[in-house]
Amino acid sequence: MEIMEKLKLLKNNIANIISLLIIPNSLVSFYFIIQEEVFLAFLFIIICFFLDTLDGYIARKMKIVSNMGQAIDLFCDLIVYLMFPIFFIFNYLNFNLFVTFFICSIVLISGIIKLARFSKEGFVVINNEKYYRGLVVPFVLLTTAVFYILHINNFIYINILFPLAIILISILMVSNLKFKKISNFAWYILAILLLWMIY
Protein backbone atom coordinates (compact mmCIF):
# COMPACT_ATOMS: atom_id res chain seq x y z
CA MET A 1 0.00 0.00 0.00
CA GLU A 2 2.86 2.33 0.84
CA ILE A 3 4.47 1.67 -2.56
CA MET A 4 1.20 2.44 -4.34
CA GLU A 5 0.88 5.72 -2.45
CA LYS A 6 4.41 6.68 -3.43
CA LEU A 7 3.72 5.83 -7.07
CA LYS A 8 0.55 7.91 -6.95
CA LEU A 9 2.49 10.80 -5.41
CA LEU A 10 5.11 10.49 -8.15
CA LYS A 11 2.42 10.45 -10.84
CA ASN A 12 0.73 13.53 -9.40
CA ASN A 13 4.03 15.43 -9.34
CA ILE A 14 5.73 14.21 -12.52
CA ALA A 15 4.92 17.44 -14.38
CA ASN A 16 6.25 19.51 -11.46
CA ILE A 17 9.46 17.46 -11.41
CA ILE A 18 9.97 18.15 -15.11
CA SER A 19 9.31 21.86 -14.51
CA LEU A 20 11.88 21.95 -11.71
CA LEU A 21 14.50 20.43 -14.03
CA ILE A 22 14.39 23.77 -15.81
CA ILE A 23 16.14 25.40 -12.83
CA PRO A 24 19.52 23.58 -13.04
CA ASN A 25 19.52 23.75 -16.84
CA SER A 26 18.85 27.49 -16.77
CA LEU A 27 21.67 27.99 -14.27
CA VAL A 28 24.01 26.19 -16.67
CA SER A 29 22.88 28.49 -19.48
CA PHE A 30 23.63 31.57 -17.33
CA TYR A 31 27.06 30.11 -16.55
CA PHE A 32 27.84 29.71 -20.24
CA ILE A 33 26.84 33.32 -20.91
CA ILE A 34 29.48 34.39 -18.38
CA GLN A 35 31.99 32.01 -19.98
CA GLU A 36 31.21 33.51 -23.42
CA GLU A 37 30.00 30.16 -24.75
CA VAL A 38 26.95 31.50 -26.58
CA PHE A 39 26.04 28.30 -28.42
CA LEU A 40 26.06 26.28 -25.20
CA ALA A 41 24.09 28.99 -23.40
CA PHE A 42 21.35 28.81 -26.02
CA LEU A 43 21.54 25.02 -26.16
CA PHE A 44 20.70 24.74 -22.47
CA ILE A 45 18.02 27.42 -22.57
CA ILE A 46 16.39 25.57 -25.49
CA ILE A 47 16.49 22.41 -23.37
CA CYS A 48 14.60 24.46 -20.78
CA PHE A 49 12.10 25.42 -23.48
CA PHE A 50 11.55 21.75 -24.39
CA LEU A 51 11.04 20.89 -20.72
CA ASP A 52 8.58 23.79 -20.39
CA THR A 53 6.42 22.48 -23.22
CA LEU A 54 6.76 18.89 -22.02
CA ASP A 55 5.56 19.56 -18.48
CA GLY A 56 2.42 21.27 -19.75
CA TYR A 57 1.70 18.45 -22.19
CA ILE A 58 2.08 15.79 -19.48
CA ALA A 59 -0.03 17.76 -17.00
CA ARG A 60 -2.88 18.03 -19.51
CA LYS A 61 -2.68 14.44 -20.73
CA MET A 62 -2.54 12.99 -17.21
CA LYS A 63 -5.08 15.53 -15.94
CA ILE A 64 -2.87 16.61 -13.06
CA VAL A 65 -3.06 20.38 -13.52
CA SER A 66 -2.68 22.06 -10.12
CA ASN A 67 -2.26 25.55 -8.68
CA MET A 68 1.19 24.60 -7.43
CA GLY A 69 2.20 23.35 -10.88
CA GLN A 70 0.97 26.54 -12.50
CA ALA A 71 2.93 28.64 -9.99
CA ILE A 72 6.13 26.67 -10.65
CA ASP A 73 5.58 27.01 -14.40
CA LEU A 74 5.10 30.77 -14.02
CA PHE A 75 8.42 31.21 -12.20
CA CYS A 76 10.22 28.99 -14.73
CA ASP A 77 8.81 31.09 -17.59
CA LEU A 78 10.11 34.19 -15.83
CA ILE A 79 13.62 32.72 -15.73
CA VAL A 80 13.73 31.25 -19.24
CA TYR A 81 11.89 33.84 -21.30
CA LEU A 82 12.70 37.04 -19.40
CA MET A 83 15.72 36.77 -17.09
CA PHE A 84 17.89 34.80 -19.53
CA PRO A 85 17.33 37.24 -22.42
CA ILE A 86 17.94 40.23 -20.14
CA PHE A 87 21.18 38.75 -18.81
CA PHE A 88 22.21 37.94 -22.38
CA ILE A 89 21.38 41.45 -23.59
CA PHE A 90 23.59 43.03 -20.92
CA ASN A 91 26.48 40.81 -22.00
CA TYR A 92 26.16 40.75 -25.80
CA LEU A 93 23.70 43.38 -27.04
CA ASN A 94 24.58 46.24 -24.71
CA PHE A 95 25.22 49.11 -27.13
CA ASN A 96 24.41 51.86 -24.63
CA LEU A 97 24.15 51.21 -20.90
CA PHE A 98 21.31 53.68 -20.27
CA VAL A 99 19.29 52.34 -23.22
CA THR A 100 19.95 48.77 -22.12
CA PHE A 101 18.75 49.47 -18.57
CA PHE A 102 15.65 51.15 -19.98
CA ILE A 103 14.61 48.43 -22.47
CA CYS A 104 15.39 45.61 -20.03
CA SER A 105 13.30 47.28 -17.33
CA ILE A 106 10.41 47.82 -19.75
CA VAL A 107 10.46 44.27 -21.12
CA LEU A 108 10.75 42.74 -17.64
CA ILE A 109 7.80 44.76 -16.30
CA SER A 110 5.70 43.99 -19.38
CA GLY A 111 6.64 40.31 -19.26
CA ILE A 112 5.69 39.97 -15.59
CA ILE A 113 2.35 41.67 -16.28
CA LYS A 114 1.79 39.32 -19.23
CA LEU A 115 2.59 36.21 -17.18
CA ALA A 116 0.38 37.34 -14.29
CA ARG A 117 -2.50 38.11 -16.64
CA PHE A 118 -2.24 34.76 -18.41
CA SER A 119 -2.06 32.97 -15.06
CA LYS A 120 -5.34 34.62 -14.10
CA GLU A 121 -7.20 34.58 -17.44
CA GLY A 122 -5.75 31.69 -19.44
CA PHE A 123 -6.51 31.43 -23.14
CA VAL A 124 -9.13 33.41 -25.00
CA VAL A 125 -11.24 30.87 -26.91
CA ILE A 126 -12.95 32.05 -30.10
CA ASN A 127 -14.76 29.53 -32.33
CA ASN A 128 -12.92 26.67 -30.57
CA GLU A 129 -9.57 28.29 -31.41
CA LYS A 130 -7.14 29.23 -28.64
CA TYR A 131 -5.73 32.75 -28.58
CA TYR A 132 -3.40 34.63 -26.25
CA ARG A 133 -4.33 38.11 -25.09
CA GLY A 134 -1.09 39.91 -25.81
CA LEU A 135 2.10 38.54 -27.32
CA VAL A 136 3.62 35.57 -25.47
CA VAL A 137 6.86 35.99 -23.50
CA PRO A 138 8.93 33.49 -25.57
CA PHE A 139 9.09 36.21 -28.23
CA VAL A 140 11.51 38.10 -25.96
CA LEU A 141 13.91 35.16 -26.13
CA LEU A 142 13.27 34.71 -29.86
CA THR A 143 13.93 38.38 -30.63
CA THR A 144 17.12 38.37 -28.57
CA ALA A 145 18.42 35.33 -30.46
CA VAL A 146 17.52 36.77 -33.88
CA PHE A 147 19.18 40.11 -33.21
CA TYR A 148 22.29 38.41 -31.82
CA ILE A 149 22.56 36.45 -35.08
CA LEU A 150 22.17 39.69 -37.04
CA HIS A 151 24.76 41.37 -34.82
CA ILE A 152 27.46 38.73 -35.32
CA ASN A 153 26.79 38.96 -39.07
CA ASN A 154 27.45 42.72 -38.96
CA PHE A 155 23.90 43.80 -39.74
CA ILE A 156 23.77 47.60 -39.70
CA TYR A 157 21.73 49.75 -37.32
CA ILE A 158 21.38 46.95 -34.75
CA ASN A 159 22.00 49.49 -31.99
CA ILE A 160 18.83 51.32 -33.10
CA LEU A 161 16.61 48.49 -34.36
CA PHE A 162 17.12 46.15 -31.40
CA PRO A 163 15.91 48.58 -28.68
CA LEU A 164 12.94 49.52 -30.87
CA ALA A 165 12.08 45.83 -31.35
CA ILE A 166 12.22 45.18 -27.59
CA ILE A 167 10.01 48.20 -26.88
CA LEU A 168 7.51 47.02 -29.51
CA ILE A 169 7.41 43.52 -28.02
CA SER A 170 6.93 45.00 -24.55
CA ILE A 171 3.91 46.96 -25.77
CA LEU A 172 2.45 43.95 -27.58
CA MET A 173 2.78 41.73 -24.51
CA VAL A 174 0.52 43.97 -22.42
CA SER A 175 -1.82 44.83 -25.28
CA ASN A 176 -5.32 43.41 -25.73
CA LEU A 177 -4.49 42.15 -29.21
CA LYS A 178 -5.21 38.46 -29.71
CA PHE A 179 -2.51 36.15 -31.04
CA LYS A 180 -3.24 32.61 -32.17
CA LYS A 181 -1.52 29.83 -30.24
CA ILE A 182 1.51 28.56 -32.17
CA SER A 183 1.98 24.79 -32.19
CA ASN A 184 4.85 23.35 -30.17
CA PHE A 185 6.16 21.65 -33.32
CA ALA A 186 6.57 25.02 -35.04
CA TRP A 187 8.43 26.36 -32.00
CA TYR A 188 10.70 23.27 -32.00
CA ILE A 189 11.64 23.77 -35.67
CA LEU A 190 12.32 27.46 -35.05
CA ALA A 191 14.43 26.71 -31.96
CA ILE A 192 16.56 24.15 -33.82
CA LEU A 193 17.00 26.53 -36.76
CA LEU A 194 18.13 29.38 -34.51
CA LEU A 195 20.52 27.09 -32.64
CA TRP A 196 22.04 26.00 -35.95
CA MET A 197 22.47 29.63 -37.04
CA ILE A 198 24.15 30.54 -33.74
CA TYR A 199 26.53 27.59 -34.08
Where do the model's predicted regions map?
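C-terminal membrane-associated helical module and adjoining short loops/tails
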Residues: M1-I3, N128-Y199
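Topogenic membrane-insertion module of multi-pass membrane proteins
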Residues: M1-T53, L172-I198
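C-terminal ends of transmembrane helices
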Residues: E5, G56-V65, I112-I126, I171-K181
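Membrane-water interface of alpha-helical transmembrane segments
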Residues: E5, L9-S19, Q35-F39, Q70, ...
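Multi-pass membrane catalytic core of lipid/isoprenoid biosynthesis enzymes
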Residues: L10-L20, L27, K61-F118, V140
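Hydrophobic alpha-helical transmembrane segments of polytopic
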Residues: I18-L21, A41-C48, I103-I106, S110, ...
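Helix-coil boundary and interhelical linker segments in multi-pass alpha-helical membrane proteins
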Residues: V28-L43, I79-C104, A145-L161, I198-Y199
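Short glycine/serine/threonine-biased micro-segments
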Residues: I46, L54, N67, I109, ...
